[in-house]
Amino acid sequence: MGFQYKKVLLIGATSGIGRALAERFINEGSYVIAVGRRKEKLEELVHKYGHDKVSAVPFDITKMNAIPAFATNVIGTHDDLDCIVLNSGIQRKVDFSKPEEVDLDVVNEEFVTNYLSQVAITKAFLPFLMKKSNETALVYTSSGLSLVPILRCMNYCASKAALHHFVLSLRVQLRTTKVKVVELFPPAVQTELHDAKHQPDIKDGNKMGMPLDDFIEETYQGLAGGFEQIPIGRSKTSFQAFEMKRQEVFSEAVKSMSGGEIDWTPHGTVPQ
């Protein structure tokens, strides 16, 4: 089974996981609409692969008031869009044992980027996706840290936990539609997310974690396999240890609160 979607809107495509996923989709035959803040990075992608395989849309997703117009523009230009990958994310150190050093503007920016903008994008594109006669997909890059936090980036973990809970509920809410809801759970991956520019307190941060090529290969195989929840690398440990059981409890709660009308189970949504 191969990746079935032919036109992918990839938000956060300028570097790291997003850039590598964009290139993998292109190489596998999907057309990619690459979105990000850094126009020059998007243009590099178009120059490398050509306009017949990729297009660039510079956009800052933290400008939330502009998201509806952004969605209208994309839909108007690409009415055959069938997959949206929401991959944008930032990670910053926060230490509340030194409250005088905590910058709430940074805390807010991280939450807007990693969670609130993703909710706004979902709302903006869902009416279009739900009207399509063919299956479409929303793919969210969550994190293994949405399941088990670490101290140094507590707000990042909280933002990803919020996204995870949103996605889990969204999947059930959209169960009767043709919109598939997919969540990726990356471990630490060797990208610029941890480099000296973005997190100077981490030594050799861009060498920390799973090699990017290995991550992309495992991720793509999960996507091509049609799975809805894809823990990768070390994230599998947390997912297998307790997350499946927690989702069973969630499933029971959903069934109970719906008077038995909604019978959803997480089994079969995850690679074994």
Feature map (PLM): residue ranges:
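Conserved glycine-rich cofactor-binding loop
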Residues: 14-15
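Residue(s) in the substrate-gating loop at a strand-loop-helix junction
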Residues: 143
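Conserved mid-core segment of classical short-chain dehydrogenase/reductases
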Residues: 68, 75, 90-108, 152
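SDR active-site lid
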Residues: 165, 171-234
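Active-site helix of classical SDR
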Residues: 122, 159
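Rossmann-fold cofactor-recognition segment
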Residues: 49-65
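Conserved glycine-rich Rossmann-like NAD(P)H-binding loop of the short-chain dehydrogenase/reductase
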Residues: 28-44
